């Protein structure tokens, strides 16, 4: 990271080395998201570079799973931001407040897209207030030889592929007065079959059994 003395992040340089296993599969796209989902969080960066290498190894081929590469890049960048805050003597919350991308900002690190929807500033403030950050940061002496501390990190992650993975549902009333809800979501432990039926029943003001 490169930053001014008051903590404005001006440059980000990120390198990711990814193990894709025996076959390519998702290798290039997964590693790409480690930069694609981390660098754009910091809207004041004027220079940024993302370099990655994907290597074959004698392991099971890698695939998509929970975060899809974003978590690795975010962990690295957020750790570096915390180190920067410590080096400059600035509260990690404050340094993020000064740098985060806001709604309406153009994001050069995100293909120049305009951020049309973003509540990151409000989310950050809510976390700060609800956990009592000012009372707990940096550490609190418990008086028994132990201390308690708080830390902070940010993340962004979308769901699906833009313009490809889209969601829809159809609701039909049957001759017998019952409803049929048709969805394309697969319940992989998320409970969507139950949850979406509950939502429909609430909106229709009918029992779930209907």
Question: What is the meaning of each model-derived region?
Answer:
Residues 1-73, 144-210:
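Gly/Pro-rich active-site capping loops and adjacent beta-alpha segments
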Residues 1-5, 62-87, 108-133, 150:
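Glycine-rich and small/hydrophobic secondary-structure elements
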Residues 3-5, 20, 49, 81-88, ...:
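Structural signal for hydrophobic packing residues in well-ordered secondary-structure cores
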Residues 5-34, 87-125:
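Molybdopterin (Moco) oxidoreductase catalytic core of the xanthine/aldehyde oxidoreductase family
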Residues 100-178:
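Helix-loop-helix junctions that connect adjacent transmembrane helices in secondary transporters/permeases
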């Amino acid at each position: 990271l490169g930053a001014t003395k008051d903590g404005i992040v001006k440059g980000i340089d990120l390198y990711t080395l990814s193990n894709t296993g025996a076959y390519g599969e998702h290798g290039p796209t997964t590693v790409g998201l480690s930069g694609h989902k981390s660098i754009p969080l910091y809207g004041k960066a004027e220079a940024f570079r993302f370099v990655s290498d994907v290597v074959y190894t004698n392991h099971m081929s890698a695939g998509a799973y929970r975060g899809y590469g974003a978590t690795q890049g975010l962990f690295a960048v957020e750790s570096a931001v915390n180190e920067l805050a410590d080096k400059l003597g600035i509260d990690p919350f404050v340094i993020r407040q000064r740098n985060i991308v806001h709604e309406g900002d153009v994001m050069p690190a995100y293909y120049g897209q305009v951020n049309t929807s973003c509540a990151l500033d409000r989310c950050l403030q809510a976390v700060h207030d609800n956990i009592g950050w000012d009372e707990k940061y940096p550490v609190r002496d418990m008086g028994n030889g132990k201390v308690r501390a708080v830390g902070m990190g940010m993340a962004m992650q979308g769901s699906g592929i833009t313009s490809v993975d889209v969601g829809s549902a159809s609701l039909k009333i049957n001759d017998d007065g019952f409803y049929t809800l048709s969805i394309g979501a697969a319940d992989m432990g998320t409970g969507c079959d139950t949850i979406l039926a509950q939502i429909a029943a609430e909106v229709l003001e009918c029992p779930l059994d209907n």
